[in-house]
Curated annotation (Swiss-Prot):
Keywords: Electron transport, Heme, Iron, Membrane, Metal-binding, Mitochondrion, Mitochondrion inner membrane, Respiratory chain, Transmembrane, Transmembrane helix, Transport, Ubiquinone. The chain crosses the membrane at residues 33-53, 77-98, 113-133, 178-198, 226-246, 288-308, 320-340, 347-367. This is Cytochrome b. Binds 2 heme b groups non-covalently. Component of the ubiquinol-cytochrome c reductase complex (complex III or cytochrome b-c1 complex) that is part of the mitochondrial respiratory chain. The b-c1 complex mediates electron transfer from ubiquinol to cytochrome c. Contributes to the generation of a proton gradient across the mitochondrial membrane that is then used for ATP synthesis. Its main location: mitochondrion. It comes from Saiga tatarica (Saiga antelope). It comes from the Eukaryota.
Length: 380
C-alpha cells in the first residue's frame, strides 16, 4: 500500500515540507529559529484573537478595555502578557534568524532573503501598530512621533500624515485603523512566510560550512522535528518565565497612564526591539536625513548579496569577517542602549559614532575584509 502522506494532495505538501524534506546533516541550533518564528506567529495570532474579543478600538474605552481584560476576563492577564512578551520573543528570534543568515551567507538565496526582509518590515509595522492599541501615554506619543516622521517626505509629506491619521492629529480614526491593520497583517505575514518556505525548499537549506550538502542529506523527520521541539520547549519556558515572573520587565511604565494629548512624557521611546533604529534616526539632526537613515538601516539587508565579495559563502573559515560580524552585533547592542537614553551629552555623540560605525561596517569594512581574506588565501 502506498503511503497516504505521499499521495494525498494536501498531505503531500506537508510531507515534502516537514517530513521527507532532505536537510543537511550538519545544521546547528542556529537553524532552529525559523520554526521558532512560526511558533511565535501562531502564538501571537491565537492570543491576539482572544484579546480582540474583549478589546474596543475607541479612544474613550481602549485603555479601560485592556484593564478589563487583565482584571475581569478569565485568564485575561496571562493572554495579554503572553501577547505583549510574545512580541519580544518574536523579535529576539527574528534578530537571531537574520544574524544567522548574515553569518553563514544565507542571503545568497535571493528570493528567500528578499521575502525575509519584507517579512521583517511587515512584522515591525505590526508590532508598532500593536503598541498603539492600549492607548497609554507611550502608545499615543509613540504613534504621534513615528507617524509625524512621514511629514519629512517632500511635497506630499503633510498630506500623507493627515491621511494616515484620518484627521489633524492622532485620534479615534487613527486608533480604529491601526487596530484593523494590526489584526490583518499577521495573516499576511503567515502567507508571506509560506512563500518564504516555498522559495527555501526550491534550493534546500544552507549549512554552517556554506558548502553544498547535496551529497549528505538526511530526512527532516525525525532528526530535525525533535530538535525543533526542544527549541520550542525552551522558547515557551523563557516566555512563561517572563510572563509569570516579570511581565512588565520589557514594557514602559508610562503606558500604565491613559493617553493624554496635553501632557508629553519626558522620554518618548518605542519598544526595546526598535531602539537600535530609533537611535540611528535620532543621531541625524536633519528630519528627512534621519528618516532615510532609519529606513536604510533595515533596507541595507537587501544589499547584502551585492556586498558579498568573498569567494566563500559562510564566515565559518573567515576569522577577519567573524571579528567584524561580532563588532556589528556589539554596535547594534550599543545602539539599542542609546535609543533608550535621553537626548543629551554624551549619549548623542555615542549614538552618532555607533550609527556611522553601523553603516561603515556593512558597506565598507566587511566587503574589504572579505577581499583581504581572498588575497590571503590567494583566491583572486
Amino acid at each position: 500500500m502506498i503511503n497516504i502522506r505521499k499521495t494525498h494532495p494536501l498531505m503531500k505538501i506537508v510531507n515534502n515540507a516537514f517530513i521527507d524534506l532532505p536537510a543537511p546533516s550538519n545544521i546547528s541550533s542556529w537553524w532552529n529559529f525559523g520554526s521558532l518564528l512560526g511558533i511565535c506567529l501562531i502564538l501571537q495570532i491565537l492570543t491576539g484573537l482572544f484579546l480582540a474579543m474583549h478589546y474596543t478600538a475607541d479612544t474613550a474605552t481602549a485603555f479601560h478595555s485592556v484593564t478589563h481584560i487583565c482584571r475581569d476576563v478569565n485568564y485575561g492577564w496571562i493572554i495579554r502578557y503572553m501577547h505583549a512578551n510574545g512580541a519580544s520573543m518574536f523579535f529576539i528570534c527574528l534578530f537571531m534568524h537574520v544574524g544567522r543568515g548574515l553569518y553563514y551567507g544565507s542571503y545568497t538565496f535571493l528570493e528567500t532573503w528578499n521575502i525575509g526582509v519584507i517579512l521583517l518590515f511587515a512584522t515591525m509595522a505590526t508590532a508598532f501598530m500593536g503598541y498603539v492599541l492600549p492607548w497609554g501615554q507611550m502608545s499615543f506619543w509613540g504613534a504621534t512621533v513615528i507617524t509625524n516622521l512621514l511629514s519629512a517626505i517632500p511635497y506630499i509629506g503633510t498630506d500623507l500624515v493627515e491621511w494616515i491619521w484620518g484627521g489633524f492629529s492622532v485620534d479615534k480614526a487613527t486608533l480604529t485603523r491601526f487596530f484593523a491593520f494590526h489584526f490583518i497583517l499577521p495573516f499576511i505575514i503567515a502567507a508571506l512566510a509560506m512563500v518564504h518556505l516555498l522559495f527555501l525548499h526550491e534550493t534546500g537549506s544552507n549549512n554552517p560550512t556554506g558548502i553544498p550538502s547535496d551529497s549528505d542529506k538526511i530526512p527532516f523527520h525525525p532528526y530535525y522535528t525533535i530538535k525543533d521541539i526542544l527549541g520550542a520547549l525552551l522558547l515557551i519556558l523563557i516566555l512563561m518565565l517572563l510572563v509569570l515572573f516579570s511581565p512588565d520587565l520589557l514594557g514602559d511604565p508610562d503606558n500604565y497612564t491613559p493617553a493624554n494629548p496635553l501632557n508629553t512624557p519626558p522620554h518618548i521611546k518605542p519598544e526595546w526591539y526598535f531602539l537600535f533604529a530609533y537611535a540611528i534616526l535620532r543621531s541625524i539632526p536633519n528630519k528627512l536625513g534621519g528618516v532615510l537613515a532609519l529606513v536604510l538601516s533595515i533596507l541595507i539587508l537587501v544589499l547584502m548579496p551585492l556586498l558579498h565579495t568573498s569567494k566563500q559563502r559562510s564566515m565559518m573559515f573567515r576569522p577577519i569577517s567573524q571579528c567584524l560580524f561580532w563588532v556589528l552585533v556589539a554596535d547594534l547592542l550599543t545602539l539599542t542602549w542609546i535609543g533608550g537614553q535621553p537626548v543629551e551629552y554624551p549619549y548623542i555623540t555615542i549614538g552618532q559614532l555607533a550609527s556611522i560605525m553601523y553603516f561603515l561596517l556593512i558597506l565598507v569594512l566587511m566587503p574589504v575584509a572579505s577581499t583581504i581574506e581572498n588575497n590571503l588565501l590567494k583566491w583572486k
